[in-house]
Amino acid sequence: MGLVGCVGKSSLVSMELRWARRRKSDNAASALPRSIPIYISTLKKDINLEELRNLYSLCNHSCNRLSEKDSNVEKIVDMKKLRRAISRSDVIVSVFCKPQHVDVDDAVLYSEEESLSSSLYTSEFGRQNKDDSFLGDLFQNAVPLTPSNGQLVGFGRAYSDYGLTASIHDLMVLPSLQRMGIGKLIVNRIVRLLTSRDIYDIAALCFEDERPFFKACGFGDDRMGSTTMMFTKSLEA
C-alpha cells in the first residue's frame, strides 16, 4: 500500500452522460456491447447506500486496509458507518449504466445481494435479464439513462482539509466493466473537483498493484518519498 500525488485542473460538471468503450483486444467480454452509455454524477443524493455496499462486495473491496489484499470480503462496513463516511466525504463520484449492459454473472450476484426494501431503484419495469422479451429490452434501451433507472457500477470519493491536502479512497469499478476507462474518468473527475477548490496536494491510498493505474492517471511518488503507515497496535484498556 502506498501514497501517490497528483496535480491537475479543469472545468466542473455535476452530472454528465458519456460513452465507455471496450478495447478490441478484450475478448473476455465479447458477449457484451463494445460501447455503452454511462452516467457520471458528483451528487451525494444519487448514491443508494445498499447498492454501494453491494458494489464493495462485487469488487471484493474492503474498507479495512489491514485485511489481506486477495482475501474475499466477507463482511462489508456496516450501513451506519458507510452512511457517515459518505456524508463526510468532500467529493463523491458515482457511475451508472443500464442493467442489461452488465455481465450476467455480475447481474446475478447483484440481484442476490440487493435489498429491495431499501433500494431507490425499484420500478414497475424491473431489472432486465437476458431472457426478457424483445419489447422489454427495446423499451429499456429507449429510456434515457439516469441514476434512478441505472445500476451503480463505479465509485470513488475523497477527503480534504478544504485548504491544503486531499486523499482519494475506495475507487471501484464493477469487474465486467473494467478496462473501459471508467476508473480513469472517476479519478479525473475527483481531481478536477479538488483542484477547482485550489487543492493540489492530492494523494491516492492504493495497493501496490494499483500503482500503475494511478500512475497512468497522473500520479507519482512525492518529493519526500513518503509512504502510508497504518496504526496496527492493539489499544490497551
From Swiss-Prot:
Compartmental location: Plastid, Chloroplast
This enzyme's EC code(s): 2.3.1.48
A GO CC term attached to the entry: chloroplast
GO MF terms, alphabetically ordered: glucosamine 6-phosphate N-acetyltransferase activity; N-acetyltransferase activity
Keywords: Acyltransferase, Chloroplast, Plastid, Transferase, Transit peptide
Biological process, per Gene Ontology: N-terminal protein amino acid acetylation; peptidyl-lysine acetylation
UniProt PTM: Autoacetylated.
Catalytic activity: an N-terminal L-alpha-aminoacyl-[protein] + acetyl-CoA = N-terminal N(alpha)-acetyl-L-alpha-aminoacyl-[protein] + CoA + H(+); L-lysyl-[protein] + acetyl-CoA = N(6)-acetyl-L-lysyl-[protein] + CoA + H(+)
Tissue expr: Expressed in green tissues.
Residue ranges occupied by any N-acetyltransferase domain in the UniProt entry: 94-237
SUPFAM superfamilies: Acyl-CoA N-acyltransferases (Nat)
First and last residues of the transit peptide: 1-93
Superkingdom, taxonomy of origin: Eukaryota
Residue numbers binding acetyl-CoA: L171, M172, V173, R179, M180, G181, I182, G183, K184, F207, E208, D209, F214
PANTHER family, sorted: GCN5-RELATED N-ACETYLTRANSFERASE 3, CHLOROPLASTIC, GLUCOSAMINE 6-PHOSPHATE N-ACETYLTRANSFERASE
UniProt function note: Protein acetyltransferase with dual specificity triggering both N-alpha-acetylation (NTA) and epsilon-lysine acetylation (KA), possibly with a low efficiency or toward specific plastid substrates.
UniProt similarity note: Belongs to the acetyltransferase family. GNAT subfamily.
Quaternary structure annotation from Swiss-Prot or TrEMBL: Oligomer.
Protein name: GCN5-related N-acetyltransferase 3, chloroplastic
